[in-house]
């Protein structure tokens, strides 16, 4: 006769803390730079596997910042957000919605968001629908670009990401949420009214 030990369950640092879901699947917004969503995905290459991280403006579905790196670090996230802030005029009620990954919940990221007056919103654990805009982007970008070919290294992934995001997705890809306009067309319509 032998005893069966219960399996140890690892608890993440922030699992029991209250991390607010401010966005609460309310993706609609009437103007740019009110609600941003962010996440990262894994892309295989022959030499090194890399991560693509993006920030999408919920208003137009435009990718306003993106970055590729072989490592997921909090500094990587800070640089991504900093890049978005350099490109866009934001207000004090901007919401950045992410998952609860360790990079997003890190001290470095929280310390960067606070002085920039960005309200950080988090998806519920194991609930990707809370970040549906970003998850949808990754679904289609993998289907339309990354899963259709093999990449040798990070430079090939960067080139493919640039061509897909800047040359197709932001400029030409229609979205039903934008009345079938591209993200750039939606923002142009807003700023020329």
Describe the role of every protein-language-model region.
Residues 1-31, 127, 182-190:
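Basic, flexible linker segments flanking DNA-binding modules
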Residues 29-64, 70-72:
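An active-site-proximal beta-strand-loop segment
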Residues 48, 67-89:
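Active-site beta-loop-alpha junctions of metal-dependent nucleic acid enzymes
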Residues 1-8, 96-100, 114-133, 149-152:
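RNase H-like polynucleotidyl transferase catalytic core
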Residues 23, 39, 55, 61, ...:
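Mobile genetic element proteins and their domesticated derivatives, centered on retroelements
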Residues 91-105:
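Cysteine/selenocysteine-centered motifs that mediate thiol-based redox chemistry or coordinate metal-sulfur cofactors
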Residues 114-118, 140-193:
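C-terminal domain-tail junction helix/linker
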